[in-house]
Amino acid sequence: MKIKTEPIGSIPRPLELIEGMQAHALGRLDDNGLNKLIDAALADTIKRFEATGSPVITDGEQSKPSFATYPIRGSKQLDPHGVIIPFADGHTRQLPSITGGPFQYQVYANTYLEKAKRLTALPVKQAVIAASALSLLYPQTGIINYSRQQFIQDLLNEAEADIRKSLDSGAYNVQIDFTEARLALKLDPSGGLLQAFIDLNNKVLGRFTEEERKRIGVHSCPGGDHDSTHSADVSYADLLPFLFQLQAGNFYLEYAGEKDKHSVLASIKENMGASQTVFLGVTNVLDPGVETPEEIRDMILEATEIIPVNQFGTTDDCGFSPFADDTSTGRDIAFEKIKARIDGTLLAEKLLNKTTVNLTT
């Protein structure tokens, strides 16, 4: 039996690309110059992904400004002073807010996918941002002649199109980044905000067939930016009863960074559905230390004592650099961790298959 293994998405950008993005934003580098840097980073990312032996790859999100804001890049209807997200180490990230409607994506994720697919024969996975995250773009003060209800309807249509375009463009699967799930419980422990997010995302997922939803997954983590988190103190026992309500086939969960792994596994077993597959993070993206394949093997063997192997897979805890300017994790370290995940998964797979053979002979 094969154990599925997939990356989450982002890979740290080369320093020359980060500097190029900053220069471009200041008007010191033209579009052509930036595109050359992006093309070089993308080609190198795919080459290095292939060298890890990964059966599925991503484009490393080399040209995304961030995992959350790519759809609104270049929009003329933005106020930079939107929702502020605080992290445990004291730094913050701030979303913009929209200033008018109708709300439309400026960029769809399939544009990244199609570019990557031209450079590799391997299956390419595509990450998209959740509708719930983009719902935070609507200002609390409202917008004249553009109600929140109108905005939500436009958002649902655009979020559906973002997923569907990637599926139609040949994505191996599509992963919805839902990192605000845990944060929602921290902000509102009653669960009201998280349930509203779940309901909104299910309105998008409900537009897809059961077969299509087998190729759609959801990623949840406590945030990972500059080696810090925004909601690691929220328990999986509180999160998962909500999360598994989502009408998706695959769930990509931060796990390696969890202190009480036994309780996490118990909560997964209690809440996951029979048709859902859980990919556990087996590399801690906030820790610069590279896991050994043997450590990952042992983590997998422990997990598969609780989670059925046919509903189990491995991944990384989070993207390695969800925001383009994050240099806290080295590019080399990221690929070393991915290689360790691939090798550790294979070690566990061999042992599990050997045990299965022994039990049946």
At which residue positions do the language-model features occur?
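Domain-level signal for soluble alpha/beta catalytic cores
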Residues: 1-361
